[in-house]
Swiss-Prot record:
Residues 2-146 form the Globin domain. Keywords: Heme, Iron, Metal-binding, Oxygen transport, Transport. Heme b binds at residues 63, 92. The keyword Ribosomal protein does not apply. Belongs to the globin family. One of its GO terms (cellular component) is haptoglobin-hemoglobin complex. GO terms for biological process: hydrogen peroxide catabolic process. Red blood cells. This is Hemoglobin subunit beta. GO terms for molecular function: haptoglobin binding; heme binding; metal ion binding; organic acid binding; oxygen binding; oxygen carrier activity; peroxidase activity. Involved in oxygen transport from the lung to the various peripheral tissues. It comes from Aegypius monachus.
């Protein structure tokens, strides 16, 4: 993926303002609520029976933070996203058997969460840069499947 200086600035500038715990928890909770079939990968998380249960679930919060923290690795390694996610791709493919389409869904949800949290700061240019990033991360995570 080729990044312009402006794209890098838009991504890193916004990332510096992201509350990883809150945005991560919200993104994962939204994924599980909006796309309920993704819940099957989180059976060990306990009660996922309703939106309220999902939002209040401490394991969802913790894993959401973990997921968004790994996204931070992409932000730090924009020029090497494939290698950055090689091990996670292997884990999600070989051990967890996650449908790679779910990575794209989570990326789309993250865009919605960022837009909700940052409003006007999440300009169309910023959204375009972040959309490119979530696509690159989803592609890197799906790499082991190809």
């Amino acid at each position: 993926v080729h990044w312009t200086a402006e794209e890098k600035q838009l991504i890193t500038g916004l990332w510096g303002k992201v509350n990883v715990a809150d945005c991560g928890a919200e993104a994962l909770a939204r994924l599980l609520i909006v796309y309920p079939w993704t819940q099957r990968f989180f059976a060990s998380f306990g009660n996922l029976s309703s939106p309220t249960a999902i939002i209040g679930n401490p394991m969802v919060r913790a894993h959401g933070k973990k997921v968004l923290t790994s996204f931070g690795e992409a932000v730090k390694n924009l020029d090497n996203i494939k290698n950055t996610f090689a091990q996670l791709s292997e884990l999600h493919c070989d051990k967890l058997h996650v449908d790679p389409e779910n990575f794209r869904l989570l990326g789309d949800i993250l865009i919605i969460v960022l837009a909700a949290h940052f409003g006007k700061d999440f300009s169309p240019d910023c959204q375009a840069a972040w959309q490119k990033l979530v696509r690159a991360v989803a592609h890197a995570l799906a790499r082991k499947y190809h």
